[in-house]
Amino acid sequence: MNKEREARKYLRLLSVRRCRHIATIVELVREVIEPAILAPYELVDIEYGKMGGDYVLSVFVDKPEGITVNDTADLTDIISPLLDQIKPDPFPEQYFLEVTSPGLERPLKTKEQLADAVGSYIHVSLYKAVDKQKVFEGTLLSFEEDVLHMEYLDKTRRKEVEIPYSLVSKARLAVKF
């Protein structure tokens, strides 16, 4: 029983260390490549982790009129040499670099991205329930003073809700059906 508890504790510690290491890699990559991604491009997000048996560094970029395959190829040519110059190499194993569009349901990770999304249909997950709900999908009417003001459908009735930014665990654009 005691060995089992120790094993669980050790696995949790490894998991925390791995998460911290991944967060450090993402922060370092952002610091190195963000200055090189010039207008009209926008660095939306960076993710690093295992996909199947391989490590993948995903760099999500966008521009106002949308990103093309040629754009991602050009940005890969800019980003890859910058990553190769990082010393010491922060990556524990070989990885694939993927420069891609954030897609239709792009994440909204910063206050600036939320402010830019006013008028858009979004999906929001919360740490704590507001009006007995932890998930909302609807139109972002405004984002002022760290409060999201949304309109959503509750069955067939339109409702409005105010959500403190501090309660938002994840937000992304959503496709309205």
Curated annotation (Swiss-Prot):
GO biological process, one term: ribosomal small subunit assembly
Name under which the protein is recorded: Ribosome maturation factor RimP
Recorded family membership: Belongs to the RimP family.
Keywords: Cytoplasm, Ribosome biogenesis
Functional summary from the UniProt entry: Required for maturation of 30S ribosomal subunits.
Name of the gene: rimP
Species of the source: Streptococcus sanguinis (strain SK36)
PANTHER family according to UniProt: RIBOSOME MATURATION FACTOR RIMP
Keyword Metal-binding: no
Top-level division of the source organism's lineage: Bacteria
Pfam families cross-referenced by the UniProt entry: DUF150_C (PF17384), RimP_N (PF02576)
Gene3D superfamilies: Ribosome maturation factor RimP, C-terminal domain, RimP-like superfamily, N-terminal
Cellular compartments annotated: Cytoplasm
SUPFAM superfamilies: YhbC-like, C-terminal domain (SSF74942), YhbC-like, N-terminal domain (SSF75420)
GO cellular component, one term: cytosol
NCBIfam families (UniProt xref): PRK00092.1-2 (NF000928)
Alphabetized InterPro entries for the sequence: Ribosome_maturation_RimP (IPR003728), RimP_C (IPR028998), RimP_C_sf (IPR036847), RimP_N (IPR028989), RimP_N_sf (IPR035956)
Major localisation: cytoplasm
